[in-house]
Amino acid sequence: MVTIVLGSQWGDEGKGKITDLLSQKAELCCRSAGGHNAGHTIVHDDITYDFHILPSGLVSPTCVNLIGAGTVVHVPSFFKELASLDGKGLKDVRDRVFISDRAQVCFDLHAVVDGLEEAGLGTRKVGTTGKGIGPCYSDKAARRGVRIGDIMDEGVLESKLRSLEAGYRRRFGELDYNVEEEIARFKEYRSLLKPHIVDQLTLVKKFEDESASILVEGANALMLDIDYGTYPFVTSSCTGLGGAVQGVCLNPTSIKSIVGVVKAYCTRVGSGPFPTEQLNEVGEKLQVAGREFGVTTGRKRRCGWLDMVLLRYSARINHYTALNLTKLDILDDFDEIKVAVAYKLDGKELESFPASSDALEKVEIVYETLPGWKSTTMGVSKWEDLPVNAQKYVEYIEHSLGGVPIKWIGTGPARSHMIDRN
């Protein structure tokens, strides 16, 4: 049976910990979309692991890991991340991670183009990670991309990469990029990659036929989805439920649970509308207390209050069957906590979440104010040990989402800092 873990906001919700917890029982852990632009951290046995393109199921010694067809893979980053895990003592990681032959290759060329495209947008910059993800997905959609399986044929790889480079030179003129150097690097990678490349359909079907436990690890989050996010300030892949099914070629009828990960407040990295953003001491307090710096970019995250309008929209699309509320402890020192319950535009309450980012920039927020608890929840592992007002905050969120249960509550960075209400 399949469990899918998805970010419900703009990413950085803390998906790594619940994925780590659930992967202990998983036999196959999959990444379905995105690339090394994603990032999350797992603390296991007092060792911190940063994951970007690799599935975090690698922390579990018996879990097989798959990077699916919906992803884009920067090969140097793949091997760099493997080396980092090796160096921290994880066993047999190189024997337990596979890449779909249908995944796309993200070249250094794409990162160069990413920077040029961002510079050309001026004040309307998307705020990308600069990793080349958008240009790589653009090449995929335009049917000129290079797949992981193409790497095994030297002639095919060279021809396609030279064609890409020539096209971008026609568009931009001079590029700070050497195609010969990238081709030479892939001559070294070819033999190293070969043991990792698989026919994804055969691998996934084998686990499905055995009724194995499969975990799909969503990257980024719903509000960064190319279709349903705050377009155009989004990533270039499908980051919701649909992308998880498509990117791993899952049988939808095998899905047992869809876990939405919800940060107890909101954050966002990069540009784009953020209705509940607090450009004041509240935002600064959340940023400092929450240590809100991006795992991939190191950029400060923008911070604001929890947004139930956004979460209801997210739940409508992803159909969560359970929630993991994270970083509850960051709210410990607030006298009162605000929650967005409605948007108004031109004085009228909106009935649905706006598709237009321009409209989102203009909305007026209707807040409900809840009492804080002014006592520590750090490290609490039992529901009954939470302060009463912290319990009420959790129950308020459940009620606002129509009764979707919050089954896990994060109360700190360590693996043990989790309340399991199952």
Swiss-Prot record:
One of the GO biological process terms: cellular response to cadmium ion
Highest taxon listed in the record's lineage: Eukaryota
Residues annotated as binding Mg(2+): 12, 39
CDD domains registered for this protein in UniProt: AdSS
Any single GO CC term annotated in Swiss-Prot or TrEMBL for this entry: cytoplasm
Residues where IMP binds: 12-15, 37-40, 129, 143, 220, 235, 299
Co-factor note (free text): Binds 1 Mg(2+) ion per subunit.
Catalytic residue list: 12 (proton acceptor), 40 (proton donor)
Keyword GTP-binding in annotation: yes
EC number: 6.3.4.4
Keywords: Cytoplasm, GTP-binding, Ligase, Magnesium, Metal-binding, Nucleotide-binding, Purine biosynthesis
Keyword Magnesium annotated: yes
Annotated catalysed reactions: IMP + L-aspartate + GTP = N(6)-(1,2-dicarboxyethyl)-AMP + GDP + phosphate + 2 H(+)
Needed cofactors: Mg(2+)
PROSITE patterns membership: ADENYLOSUCCIN_SYN_1, ADENYLOSUCCIN_SYN_2
Gene3D superfamilies: Adenylosuccinate Synthetase, subunit A, domain 1, Adenylosuccinate Synthetase, subunit A, domain 2, Adenylosuccinate Synthetase, subunit A, domain 3
Subunit details: Homodimer.
Similarity comment: family membership: Belongs to the adenylosuccinate synthetase family.
NCBIfam families in alphabetical order: PRK01117.1, purA
Name of this chain's protein: Adenylosuccinate synthetase
Species of origin: Arthroderma otae (strain ATCC MYA-4605 / CBS 113480)
Lineage: Eukaryota, Fungi, Dikarya, Ascomycota, Pezizomycotina
